[in-house]
UniProtKB/Swiss-Prot annotation:
It is a single-pass type II membrane protein. Keywords: Aminopeptidase, Glycoprotein, Hydrolase, Membrane, Protease, Serine protease, Signal-anchor, Transmembrane, Transmembrane helix, Vacuole. This is Probable dipeptidyl-aminopeptidase B. InterPro entries: AB_hydrolase_fold, Peptidase_S9_cat, Peptidase_S9B_N, Serine_Prot_S9B/DPPIV. It comes from Blastomyces gilchristii (strain SLH14081).
Length: 915
């Protein structure tokens, strides 16, 4: 699980269409107009905008969970709003008046918007904010099928451009990969040259083919990372998945000039490596194998050993399970200094962390054959998994002097003991200095230290007691941005940009010099920044960031000067839309992603401060535009409800041809984890769309207290008592819907996956059948003592400090659960994230209290995403069919049933024989 980190990441919610849609366009197909360029790119990463992997919490939401330059429905502020209907000519005087009014309106709007962002507002909207209906198939349009949704037919195609820093400071270089090409598998292109070849260098082909031979071995590239000087490519082959983000494989060095390869470690070419990364100077690669670190310099075939005592319980340079899952959201705990002279890395000791056994009954993920006579026993994988209150891994930050070949540590006076410390971010500055972010185990005290590896000294320069500030917590993020000194551009000292708490919101701040604890505030007001900053233009002194706009379901892009002045939108903020963005290394160009509510599109643009005008379409999703003309989808109504004085965002999905005179069943869908967000303007055709569009039920989603972008007061109130306020918000909202004239209050259900599964059960428990009659919980937490320590203690503190909170948050009131008509519980047996222990212990409580109004489905060998052996299709088929039966009244609440004799028929006979 995780709070919103790097954005509200979809992967924290229930998985629906896990795989990205891979596609390859002609790499040379460009069609330019006078003002725009059409660009088709096959790039290294491809993202499915609807992909939803599975985890509790949102690591931001970069989730994430992507047409023309402008959609046909989209317009600029200058467009046709003041052109008279019928195309009549406007008289000159009228034009002057209209232009004057235009400038007054635009100026007034701009002033009002800046005041809004910087001063905020205290009165949230409580009425219907907007209604979206993206399909145009009409009353007789086709209905979507669940197979179409699960098969990805409604998933927007999206590209993730790999921006690449030029060896000589060039901006706007992109890394492209074409798996089908026999002459340009991997290459670097100057995106400006797509529009004006004379203004660009030619493309550089790094690898002609995807495969190459080394001796007798044929190497197939799975991933590839060019060196910063573009002379060598680090190639991964034989990739094998470990956990969510980690993997192992064989690594190779591929020479661009000769188009030949060699093993990264010539002395052990077949041994699997966990992680490898380039020196910023392109002259060395550091890697971890068998939890020890090594260094290969390109000038030699020799491999230097950095550490020697790594093993089962001791990790160097890579995170263990809980740090990978809950802190870094990645597979690396290694950081190169920008000059390549030093390497920082984590030493993780998990010898005290208890093991959790994961059994595999129908598969052997290890790939190893069982011993003779043990073929019929399940394979068991022991995972070091620290549950709440259990011993945590002990982490230390160490450094390696590349020139001296020496490992050392720097003592920094810390208020955190070894077993009470989390290291959540390491950021190199200049001149041998590194910023290190630490928190206590319960993640409510933040400490930032500066370490000088040249003098081997360090000190704490900033401390924040977040618990004392607002009762909240610190999310582990890695979005802090170093800003080097540049007197020519007005920056006398080094500094960094960080997200801070300011007036109850997450805002951007600039700290300079590095040891200055008092920042320059870059943003203020009602709206909150998201995973900021997104990009920094050092030459022009600009910071780009994403903000949840006038409404929490929006995302817009802005820039601001380093001194906090000249706030400017990069997107059209007059439209209620959802954008995200990635910037080139110099922030002169941006991949702008429009993600909804209309059909998503992508384009590369020049940023406003860049004088070189450029615009190129990357993706239009024409296939979705065509489909939408043939289908009838649900309409989405966005609004707010007020519960206990808190304004909460709600999205209601109404069936096609909605008739307010009818009575509709209602399904509530939720996730609800701390910092997460489910109500958004992103385009999505998912399971909820199927329920509303095809089954004809209303689907309601409310982001209750604890979720993201509704202010820290509403977010932090849940701390220490997960489930209580969140369930109340679901119930109170459901009561409001039950009172609506078009809702059948006798047919109301709720469902969720992961944290949403926990919330489903907690809501049913708290409601006791008074509002909801049915529920469906997939892979739920049922007792927070069973979940991992870093996530759980961030929001619940330790069980030793909050036993009462853990007791009340656990699903334990079986009498209340028995008061519902029926509920469904599903879980994968090999779930390494939310262990099946959660569901099994709940079943034991139900057995002890003779509760039987539920159904159970267990998926052998499936992890938290539930995919193994057709399980993903099965889980959604079961959800849909079970819901239909529930709303059809098939699930009867009958305890100790008796035979219905009226159903017996007397046997008919003929000649004494039964017929």
């Amino acid at each position: 699980m995780a709070g919103e980190k790097g954005g509200s990441r979809d992967e924290e919610r229930e998985p629906l269409t896990r795989g990205s849609i891979e596609f390859r366009d002609s790499i040379n197909s460009f069609d330019y107009s006078s003002s725009t360029a059409s660009l088709s790119l096959a790039v290294i990463d491809r993202i499915n905008g609807s992909t939803q992997d599975s985890r509790l919490g949102e690591k931001d939401q970069r989730d994430d969970d992507h047409d023309q330059y402008r959609n046909e429905e989209e317009y600029d502020v200058e467009d046709a709003d003041y052109i008279p209907s019928g195309g009549k000519t406007v008289q000159k005087t009228t034009k002057i008046v209209l232009w004057a009014l235009l400038f007054l309106c635009v100026g007034g709007w701009s002033l009002a918007f800046v005041i809004f962002l910087f001063r905020g507002h205290d009165t949230p909207q409580t009425s219907i904010a907007s209604e979206e209906n993206i399909s145009s198939g009409g009353a007789r349009g086709n209905r979507i099928t669940l197979d179409e949704v699960l098969g990805g037919e409604w998933a927007p195609r999206a590209h993730s451009i790999s921006w690449f820093p030029g060896p000589n400071g060039e901006d706007g270089l992109i890394l492209e990969k074409d798996n089908l090409s026999a002459t340009a598998y991997l290459r670097v292109e100057d995106i400006v040259g797509r529009k004006d070849p004379k203004a660009s260098k030619k493309s550089i082909v790094l690898m002609q083919k995807k495969m190459f031979t080394v001796g007798r071995e044929t190497v197939y590239s799975a991933q590839a990372w060019p060196s910063p000087d573009l002379k060598t490519v680090l190639v991964l082959s034989d990739q094998q998945k470990n956990w969510r983000h980690s993997f192992t494989g064989k690594y190779w060095l591929f020479d661009v000039e000769t188009q030949t390869g060699q093993p990264l470690d010539p002395g052990a070419p077949d041994r699997r490596i966990q992680l490898a990364s380039w020196s910023p100077q392109s002259d060395a690669v550091v890697f971890t194998r068998d939890n020890n670190m090594f260094l290969r310099k390109l000038t030699s075939n020799e491999v230097a050993t950095i550490t020697t005592d790594g093993g089962v319980d001791l990790f160097y340079g890579v995170p263990d399970w809980v740090y990978e899952e809950e802190v870094f959201s990645g597979n690396s705990a290694t950081w190169w200094a920008s000059d390549g002279d030093y390497i920082a890395f984590l030493r993780t000791n998990e010898s005290s962390v208890p093991d959790y056994p994961i059994q595999y009954f129908a598969s052997r993920p290890s790939g190893e054959n069982p011993k003779p006579g043990e073929e019929n026993y399940p394979e068991v994988r022991e995972v070091k998994y620290p549950k709440a209150g259990a011993p945590n891994p002990i982490v230390d930050l160490q450094f390696y002097d590349v020139g001296k070949g020496e490992v050392f540590s720097v003592d920094v006076t810390s208020e955190f003991a070894d077993d009470d410390r989390l290291i959540i971010e390491v950021l190199w500055a200049s001149n041998g200095k590194a910023l290190v972010r630490e928190t206590n185990r319960e993640s409510d005290i933040l400490s930032i230290a500066i370490i000088d590896v040249l003098s081997r000294t360090g000190r704490i320069v900033r401390r924040e007691d977040v618990n004392a500030l607002d009762g909240g917590w610190v999310e582990p993020t890695q979005s802090t941005r170093f800003i080097p000194a540049d007197p020519d551009h007005g920056r006398l000292d080094d500094g960094y940009i960080d997200t801070v708490i300011y007036e109850g919101r997450d805002q951007l701040a600039y700290f300079t010099p590095l040891d200055n604890p008092k920042p320059i505030m870059l943003t203020k007001g009602h709206s909150e920044v998201v995973n900021a900053p997104s990009g920094v233009d050092l030459k022009r002194g600009l910071v780009y960031f994403v903000v949840a706009g006038n409404e929490p379901w929006e995302r817009h892009i802005y820039s601001v000067n380093f001194d906090g002045t000249s706030l400017q939108p990069l997107t059209n903020v007059t439209e209620s839309s959802y954008y995200d963005v990635s910037f080139s290394n110099g922030a002169g160009y941006a991949l702008l992603n429009y993600r909804g509510p209309k059909v998503p599109w992508q384009k590369v643009i020049n940023t406003p401060a860049n004088e070189n005008s450029f615009e190129a379409i990357i993706e239009q999703n024409d296939h979705l535009s065509r489909k939408l003309r043939l289908f009838s989808l649900e309409s989405k109504v966005y609004q707010h409800v007020t519960v206990d004085g808190f304004s909460l965002p709600v999205m209601e999905r109404r069936p096609p041809n909605f008739d307010p005179a009818k009575k509709y069943p209602v399904l509530f869908h939720l996730y609800g984890g701390p910092g997460s967000q489910t109500v958004s303007k992103k385009f999505s055709v998912d399971f909820q769309s199927y329920v509303a569009s095809t089954l004809g039920y209303i689907v309601v989603t409310v982001d209750g207290r604890g979720t993201g972008h509704i202010g820290r007061k509403a977010r932090c109130i849940i701390r220490g008592n997960l489930g209580h306020y969140e369930a109340r918000d679901q119930i109170e909202t459901a009561k409001k819907w039950a009172a609506k004239p078009y809702v059948d209050e006798s047919r109301m259900a709720i469902w969720g996956w992961s944290y949403g599964g926990f919330m489903t059960l907690k809501t049913l428990e708290q409601d006791g059948g008074r509002t909801f009659q049915y529920g469906m919980a997939v892979a739920p937490v049922t007792d927070w003592r069973y979940y991992d320590s870093i996530y759980t203690e961030r929001y619940m503190r330790t069980p030793q400090h909050n036993q009462g909170g853990y007791d009340t948050s656990a699903i334990s009131n079986t009498t209340a659960l028995a008061s519902n008509i029926r509920f469904l519980l599903m879980h994968g047996t090999a779930d390494d994230n939310v262990h099946i222990q959660n569901s099994l212990t709940l079943l034991d409580k139900l057995d002890l209290d003779d509760v039987d109004n539920y159904d159970v489905h267990v998926f052998p060998d499936s992890d938290h995403s539930i995919y193994f052996h057709n399980a993903h299709k099965m889980v959604y088929n079961r959800l849909g069919d079970w819901l239909i039966n529930a709303f059809n009244g098939e699930w009867l609440k009958v305890h100790k049933p008796t035979p219905n004799n009226s159903l017996f028929r007397r046997a008919e006979t003929w000649g004494g024989l039964p017929v």
